[in-house]
Each structure stands twice: as C-alpha cells, then as structure tokens.
C-alpha cells in the first residue's frame, strides 16, 4: 500500500511541475517526434497562444528526430501563432529536431554548450 501512495505522490508532483512550466510558457519535446509527442506540443502551443497571444514561448527540445508529418505539424503551428518562439536545444536536435530548431526566428535559436545538431539529406522512399 505504501508503494501505491509513493507512486501517486510522485505522479501528482510530476503533474504539478508540468503545470508550473506551462504557466511559465515553457514547452518540452523529449524523445522521438511522433504523432503523440507532436499532438502534446501542438496543444500546448495553441493553448499558450490562446492564453496570451504575442507573449514569448520557450520550446526546449532534445530529440533524435522522427516522423516528418508529425514534425511538420509542430513546425506549421510554430509559424501559425503570433507568439514568438525561442527554441533551446538541451541535448540533441537531429533530423526533424533540426527542422524544429530552424522554425524559430533569427536570434531565437539557442543551444546548451554540449548540445548537438544533425542535419541530413531528406530521405525519400519509392
């Protein structure tokens, strides 16, 4: 029973942390760009735009890349909203992650000192 209580407390603390970051207009993409992660990021960007249009959003990314269509949904949302987006790479922005980094305007793209960016030729099948 004690393990369940600890698990519940940990989950509640995690939710509280996420809410705090969202109030500070900070959005995170950790891991692969997928339909699920893109939906999460897109929903948060649209919510923050609705909450305070034109106020800066900080978008932290650490991703090896992933789905082109999911990533382009995030990219298009970044370009659609009026809020300026500052992108901060905290580990890696590879493949689609590098495209998301490029989605920020000039002067709004940042990397932590040990971060890496990987840009490669597009992969076309068929």
Report residues per predicted region.
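Terminal-region recognition feature
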Residues: 1-126
């Amino acid at each position: 029973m004690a393990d369940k209580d600890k698990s519940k407390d940990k989950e509640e603390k995690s939710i509280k942390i996420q809410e705090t970051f969202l109030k500070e207009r900070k959005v995170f993409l950790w891991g692969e760009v997928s339909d699920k992660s893109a939906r999460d990021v897109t929903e948060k960007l649209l919510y923050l735009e609705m909450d305070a249009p034109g106020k800066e959003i900080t978008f932290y990314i650490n991703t090896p890349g992933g789905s082109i269509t999911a990533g382009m949904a995030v990219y298009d949302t970044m370009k659609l909203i009026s809020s300026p987006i500052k992108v901060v790479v905290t580990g890696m922005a590879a493949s689609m992650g590098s495209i998301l980094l490029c989605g920020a305007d000039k002067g709004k793209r940042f990397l932590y000192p040990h971060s890496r960016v990987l840009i490669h030729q597009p992969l076309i099948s068929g």
